[in-house]
């Protein structure tokens, strides 16, 4: 009811909501149509910041809600949120690769092997500095160069940590869109970019992959890594991949 009342009154505005752990979880779940059964899956640290972007329809049932950031606590002087008491299991550090020239040019890369540009290497070095004091037991990366380079830069501060490359983490195959910018795609495939933005689950790019196909191959790799980490009693695992697979 809160979102239904508030959203129509504040179109194109930034709303600050300060509440409690349970209330924040409920608001996040309601905005993203997540069952209340998953409330304990959501962590809310003291003075954390969450950023939700609403599409602006004013109707929660029709909203496309983007979770821009979640449980941010870096402003509190902590690298990562504290684990809950009696936590058992694995912590995954999920990182997207640094910038490439094609990112900067808004070209669809897919599985074309583009290296990091100067800014991408600088971004990776900042991530490396941020995670320098965080204990990492094992690292996994997409086998594409931009992800591997990012991982190797991060691991410069973690000597002895093993790195495993995995094709399952490669970016979604953009098919005939690969190498093209948005203007070229719109010219060659009119209306398809808008469909991709609004209902990506219903669109398969020509000669590319569907989101369902990416989901299936990525989940299989995640499950394999989780099972291996549990069997080897690992605590923290780094994964560096792509916007689509992450």
Can you annotate each of these PLM segments?
Residues 112-125:
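Short catalytic helix/loop segments, enriched in acidic residues and glycine
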Residues 21, 73, 98, 243:
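Active-site metal-binding loops of divalent metal-dependent hydrolases
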Residues 3-7, 125-132, 215, 219-230:
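Generic structural signal for well-ordered alpha-helical scaffold segments
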Residues 26-30, 153:
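Active-site signature of alpha/beta-hydrolase-fold catalytic machinery across serine-
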Residues 1, 125-194:
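Phosphate-coordination/substrate-recognition cap region in phosphate-metabolizing enzymes
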Residues 1, 192-213:
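Short glycine/proline- and acidic residue-enriched helix-loop micro-motifs
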Residues 11-13, 29-96, 104-107, 129-130, ...:
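Acidic, low-complexity terminal tails and accessory targeting/binding regions
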């Amino acid at each position: 009811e809160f979102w239904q009342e508030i959203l129509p009154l504040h179109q194109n505005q930034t709303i600050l909501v300060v509440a409690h752990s349970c209330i924040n979880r409920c608001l996040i779940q309601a905005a993203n149509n997540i069952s209340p059964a998953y409330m304990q899956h959501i962590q809310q640290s003291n003075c954390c910041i969450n950023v939700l972007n609403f599409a602006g329809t004013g109707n929660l049932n029709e909203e496309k809600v983007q979770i821009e950031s979640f449980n941010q606590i870096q402003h509190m002087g902590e690298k990562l949120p504290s684990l809950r008491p009696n936590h058992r299991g694995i912590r995954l550090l999920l990182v997207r690769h640094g910038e490439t020239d094609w990112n900067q040019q808004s070209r669809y890369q897919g599985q074309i092997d583009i290296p990091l540009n100067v800014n991408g290497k600088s971004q990776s070095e900042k991530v490396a500095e941020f995670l320098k004091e965080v204990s990492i037991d094992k690292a996994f990366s997409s086998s594409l160069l931009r992800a591997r380079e990012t991982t190797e830069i991060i691991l410069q501060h973690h000597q002895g940590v093993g790195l495993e490359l995995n094709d399952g983490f490669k970016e979604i195959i953009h098919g005939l869109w690969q190498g093209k910018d948005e203007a070229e795609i719109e010219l060659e495939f009119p209306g398809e970019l808008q469909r991709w933005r609004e209902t990506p689950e219903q669109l398969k790019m020509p000669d590319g992959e569907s989101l369902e196909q990416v989901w299936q191959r990525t989940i299989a790799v995640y499950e394999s890594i989780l099972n291996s980490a549990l069997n080897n009693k690992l605590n923290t695992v780094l994964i560096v991949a792509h916007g689509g697979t992450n």
